[in-house]
Every structure is written in C-alpha cells, then in structure tokens.
Amino acid sequence: MRRLLILSALATVCAVAAAPAYATNECRGLQVCVPVAGPWVLASPGEVQFQLACPKRFVVGGLDAELSSRGIDVGFVGSLGSPVNPGITTSKAAVFLGRLVRGRDSAASFRPHIGCVPASGGGQRTPTAYHAFAPGKPSVRRVSQITVRPGGLRRYVGRCAANEKLVAATHAIGFFGDAPPSASLTRSVHVTQRIAAGRVKLTIRAGRAIAGSRAIVQLDLLCAPR
C-alpha cells in the first residue's frame, strides 16, 4: 500500500510572494540542475493540485513556488522512504498542492518551480528485515493538459486505462507568463467537472479576454488496477 507524505517544505522548498526581482531557489545547492517553471495556477479555499514534470532521465531535486498572495499555502506530495532524497521522496514529476487560506483574492495564484537532477543521482529504498507490506504504488496519476481557446466552449473527457478504475479526479487552471494573471483574466475561464461511469467530463468556457495569453486546464486522474 502506498502512503503519501505531504511535505510543506523540503530543503530547497521556499514559497514567497511573487516579485519581479525574485530569483527562485529550486536549483540552489545542486551542482547539475535543470530548472522547470510551470504556469500560474489559480488557488481557492479548496485544494488544487498541479503536476510539473522533469525532462527524460531526470528526477526532482528541488522545489520552489512564487505566490501572488501571502495567503496561499503550498506543499507537495512525496513518497515515504529513507533518506529523504531525490529519487526516493521525489520522482520524475512533482504534484504541488495549493490552497488559499487567508484573504479573498479572486485572482490568487501560485507558480510552481522544480529543479531537475540526473536520475542516476537518486537513492534506492533499503529493504526491511521483516515481511510486513512496505509502502508501494497501488495507484498511478494520468495527467492531461488541455489548451484553452478564447471565446469558445470546449469539452474534454478523461478516463483511466482499460485495466484501471478511477479513484479520484481534480483539475486546475493555469496561465503561463512571468507575472500572475489579472483578476479579469482569471474570471474569463470557467471549468465544470462531472464524473459518470468512470469518466471525467470537463466543460471549459473562455472569454475573449484571454486572447494573447496562454491558458491551460490540467486534468489529474488518480487510477488504480481493477
């Protein structure tokens, strides 16, 4: 049975209010590191999840985030193991967890960052000396990214593989750019989600205000073998 450890901070993780001169720290202390920046993900009082992946043959070695508001709490999902290390606690992708815990900012958002290191630098889990079940990976995440088009309506249906069942589903709205999206921009994208017969149906509506910007919706499915 796989257990997930939600860590609000791990060595290089530091969430700060976004500022034009802020240099993120996802690669701090790492000799070989490829930085990867995600979009500005809209935050709300309900938890939002967003997955950011490393290039092939790399694993997550550091994390950071920019915040448009200090009222946003950001953490990530890590796996159990010892020592807490790239390749053990983290894998080739990181799932960020964001929530607006203070204030009523309708345009609150966070921008996830990961620092990627060569996969060979990660450790391995040490076998235990007894025969109890160690934390495993009974579920898999299926992530889809849908481009949002201005002034239109788009429907998208996501599902797990044929030999899997759907456990949970979440979606997130993101805007790529160096600065957080404005309130008028965030109000221009609306997403509704329905689950029926193991399928997740998204209805995405976008106004003309997003023309000239790059907006996406990420659908995150948690699937398990039947």
Where are these regions (language model features)?
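Bacterial N-terminal signal peptides that target proteins for export
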Residues: 1-7
